[in-house]
Amino acid sequence: MNMQITKILNNNVVVVIDDQQREKVVMGRGIGFQKRAGERINSSGIEKEYALSSHELNGRLSELLSHIPLEVMATCDRIISLAQERLGKLQDSIYISLTDHCQFAIKRFQQNVLLPNPLLWDIQRLYPKEFQLGEEALTIIDKRLGVQLPKDEVGFIAMHLVSAQMSGNMEDVAGVTQLMREMLQLIKFQFSLNYQEESLSYQRLVTHLKFLSWRILEHASINDSDESLQQAVKQNYPQAWQCAERIAIFIGLQYQRKISPAEIMFLAINIERVRKEH
């Protein structure tokens, strides 16, 4: 397939239009060397191509790749591919956010500027899959680029992966993580629990709290549920219901958000599962 160059970013990255008139950002060693806009290139020299979901994202990626070494982009692409194998489809913005983060993390490390991650402990426990991928990402960066980033970066990379699965940014992920931690603490103290983090009920609770936290921070809510079912849960699981109501009061005071009775019901069900294990 032949592609027409529309913009040369550097010797290794160009923007093209393919035969179907789709805009793409393509990479390949020396692919833009002594080339001009309007010329055509053969796909045999392309090592990687990106056709992101919008012209805006393609533009942001083009700007980013114009000043990032090919090796760094290729390394981040490998990390993203690995993440998508494990987590499923990620938002296209991950190509921009994670690559930009890793490039600056490498620069900070080379300048001996270390950025602590205050949420590292929480990220490890609340997002174990993403945290493991973050650990593997550091190994990939070390092997490919010869840079041994500190463990705090595991947490930052994991947060980018969490963000790419949802419709938020890093600030949103930090807010969700903080709210999840607070709710887990409230449940733990009410029932004097020692969480069994490998148990299915705990993992279900964490998953529920993650999506509940996103809904709370985005002013969304589940409202569609049978009132008789709510009453049944309240009667059958009175302790869990009371705990869920206390969490609703806390969120109202701390975040000025109102939780619907349906949300309280689903939260109580998940709390009861964990409480029963204790």
Curated annotation (Swiss-Prot):
This is Cryptic beta-glucoside bgl operon antiterminator. GO terms for biological process: positive regulation of DNA-templated transcription. Pfam families: CAT_RBD (PF03123), PRD (PF00874). The keyword tRNA processing does not apply. Residues 67-171, 172-278 form the PRD domain. The keyword Thylakoid does not apply. InterPro entries: BglG_antiterminators, CAT_RNA-bd_dom, CAT_RNA-bd_dom_sf, PRD, PRD_sf, Transcrpt_antitermin_CS. GO terms for molecular function: RNA binding. Belongs to the transcriptional antiterminator BglG family. The gene is bglG. It comes from the Bacteria. Phosphorylated and inactivated by BglF (eII-bgl). The degree of phosphorylation is dependent on the presence or absence of beta-glucosides which act as inducers of the operon expression. Addition of inducer result in the rapid dephosphorylation of BglG. Mediates the positive regulation of the beta-glucoside (bgl) operon by functioning as a transcriptional antiterminator. This is an RNA-binding protein that recognizes a specific sequence located just upstream of two termination sites within the operon. Keywords: Activator, Phosphoprotein, Repeat, RNA-binding, Transcription, Transcription regulation.
